[in-house]
Amino acid sequence: QGGFTAIERVSNILDEPIEIKDQVSPKFSLLENQGSYIDDTIKKLEEQNFITPLALGEIRFENVWFAYKDDDYVLKNLDFVIRPGEKIALVGPTGAGKSSIIRLLCRLYEPTKGRILIDGIDIQEIPQIELRRYMAVILQEVFLFAGDVKSNISLGDNYTSEEIESAAEKTNVASFIQELPEGYNTELRERGTNISGGQKQLLAFARAAIRNPQILILDEATANLDVGTEALIQQALNQLLTGRTAIIIAHRLSTIRNVDRIFVLKRGELIEQGSHQELISQGGLYATLHNLQMLGS
């Protein structure tokens, strides 16, 4: 069940509508049973024959255009490289295209034009199960299902107790779990209503850590912190980011001052990029958004 990761929750939570998928790409229609059977068979053969060459975490968008329908492009001629281990923040107003970039990277959709490569390989050539082992997504709204703690970390994959506990230790969630009535066997309610928002966030980090992904995608994963776990979360996040490529969808610009580069999007176009200080000095859209947030706080 290696394919079941947080990626499968992205389409329910990220902000742009995705119900039109079947209209845009008829090959996904459930009515086309024969085509689906053939596609599934080909996919299984691809997965058997695919030798994983992914190891670095380089992401490359080559002249990527994307429209959910017709020629109404929400991404326009995106052309950039994210180097292995680099931390990038995506910034822009609502509807700028931040979520669409993540959807394409997770292969919830394919580019209308152009291509996306990971470590030099077109992601359309990478079986989804491999892509999802290589990439972890951590969202603002952490989805927990009714079940014990260890199952909420492993998501049904065959990890040992030692591996689960090691992931919990690395992400500062072990001490909280040990205080629960039955430790890792404690039953959580659906959506984790019997634990705090910060504790849910730490469990999401443990989910990512156990899979040891090379690429992390975070949708402002530190947006809803409670005071009791804020320091633990920041420490766990710093450790999780070490040595990995990361893309952060930023809503609070104060949280991304230390990333390597900031990509500023407007109406699907990449209009600015640079460090926090470089973009402030340029006095463009990023500087305007930053100053507005500072005034608001």
Named regions from a protein language model:
Residues 15, 22-23, 28-297:
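ABC-type nucleotide-binding domain
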Residues 1-15:
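Cytosolic ends of transmembrane helices, especially the final helix of ABC transmembrane type-1 domains
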